[in-house]
C-alpha cells in the first residue's frame, strides 16, 4: 500500500514538474503537490492508488 506524505500541503503554488501519481479516484495527478492539494480538498477521502499514470 503506497502512501504520500501530504503534511506540508497545501502549498499556494504547485511546481510544473511531471511525476504522475494515480489517485484512488482513478485520476492521474501531475505531481505530489497537485495530488496533495486534492487530498486536502477531499478531507482525506482521496488516497494514492499507485505511482505513475492511472
Swiss-Prot record:
InterPro entries documented for this protein: Bifunctional_prot_inhibitor, Kazal_dom, Kazal_dom_sf, Prot_inh_Kazal-m
The UniProt entry, under SMART domains, shows: KAZAL
Please provide the record's keywords in A-Z order.
Answer: Disulfide bond, Glycoprotein, Protease inhibitor, Repeat, Secreted, Serine protease inhibitor
Q: Where is this site: Reactive bond 3?
A: 16-17
The subcellular location is: Secreted
Regions crossing the membrane: none
What start-end ranges are recorded for coiled-coil regions in this protein?
none
MF annotations from Gene Ontology: serine-type endopeptidase inhibitor activity
The disulfides recorded in the entry are: 6-36, 14-33, 22-54
Glycosylation sites (chain numbering): 43
GO cellular-component terms in the record? Answer: extracellular region
Residue span(s) of domain Kazal-like: 4-54
Pfam families for the chain: Kazal_1 (PF00050)
Tell me the domain comment. Avian ovomucoid consists of three homologous, tandem Kazal family inhibitory domains.
Its recorded name reads: Ovomucoid
Species this chain originates from: Casuarius bennetti (Dwarf cassowary)
Amino acid at each position: 500500500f503506497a502512501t504520500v506524505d501530504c503534511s506540508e500541503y497545501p502549498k499556494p503554488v504547485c511546481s510544473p514538474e511531471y511525476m504522475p501519481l494515480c489517485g484512488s479516484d482513478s485520476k492521474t495527478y501531475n505531481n505530489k503537490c497537485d495530488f496533495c492539494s486534492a487530498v486536502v480538498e477531499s478531507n482525506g477521502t482521496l488516497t494514492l492508488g499507485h505511482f505513475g499514470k492511472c
